[in-house]
């Protein structure tokens, strides 16, 4: 057995070591396609490195809108955007209190309203209240507003306690570019207008 102090250790010169490292790098490159920036063109890779959020946004954003009721209008339900978590994204616009559909496709449309009222005094006449909320579609295919989603309720206010009722509905619809989505509400004076209680929106699926 060769004594430990006489073990033969091959020497690798600097040039040979560089060649080995270069070969190893070339072998590993095909498996690096999943790394950020690899497999992209130089300009695309540079953009992804400098603006990663922008690169992701361009590939994932879809048309979407979320509107809230204007609390300053007590006798009408006016929708507003770009405030208190309300927004218009990727082509949606708000015109004449209606959402304009930017592109044809399948959209999930939704809306919610909350109504409240005070108790009646014993001397007052307690007549029932009719509450309703409806999402309507106006399209070039129809000469009138077509109901898409609707809820109705008769409320009989009590003598002792205030009352509170909510309505929510949502469903998917095939819509066409240029379609108009709007709402119609009965019982507007009883609406609880806040960003979390009265809202209306749609987003592409």
Curated annotation (Swiss-Prot):
**UniProt signal peptide:** 1-34
Query: SUPFAM superfamilies given for it?
Result: TNF-like
Entry keywords, A to Z: Cytokine, Glycoprotein, Membrane, Secreted, Signal
Coarse class of the primary localization is secreted
Q: What GO annotations for molecular function exist for this entry?
A: cytokine activity; signaling receptor binding; tumor necrosis factor receptor binding
Q: Which Pfam families match?
A: TNF (PF00229)
Superkingdom of the source species: Eukaryota
| Protein location | Secreted; Membrane
Sorted alphabetically, the Gene Ontology cellular component annotations on this record are:
extracellular space; plasma membrane
Q: Name one GO biological process term.
A: positive regulation of glial cell proliferation
THD domain: residues covered:
63-205
Which residues does the annotation flag as glycosylated?
A: 41, 96
Q: Which family does it belong to?
A: Belongs to the tumor necrosis factor family.
Q: What does this protein do?
A: Cytokine that in its homotrimeric form binds to TNFRSF1A/TNFR1, TNFRSF1B/TNFBR and TNFRSF14/HVEM. In its heterotrimeric form with LTB binds to TNFRSF3/LTBR. Lymphotoxin is produced by lymphocytes and is cytotoxic for a wide range of tumor cells in vitro and in vivo.
Q: How does it assemble?
A: Homotrimer, and heterotrimer of either two LTB and one LTA subunits or (less prevalent) two LTA and one LTB subunits. Interacts with TNFRSF14.
Reported disease: Psoriatic arthritis: An inflammatory, seronegative arthritis associated with psoriasis. It is a heterogeneous disorder ranging from a mild, non-destructive disease to a severe, progressive, erosive arthropathy.
Q: Would you tell me the protein name for this molecule?
A: Lymphotoxin-alpha
Instruction: Name the encoding gene, please.
Output: LTA
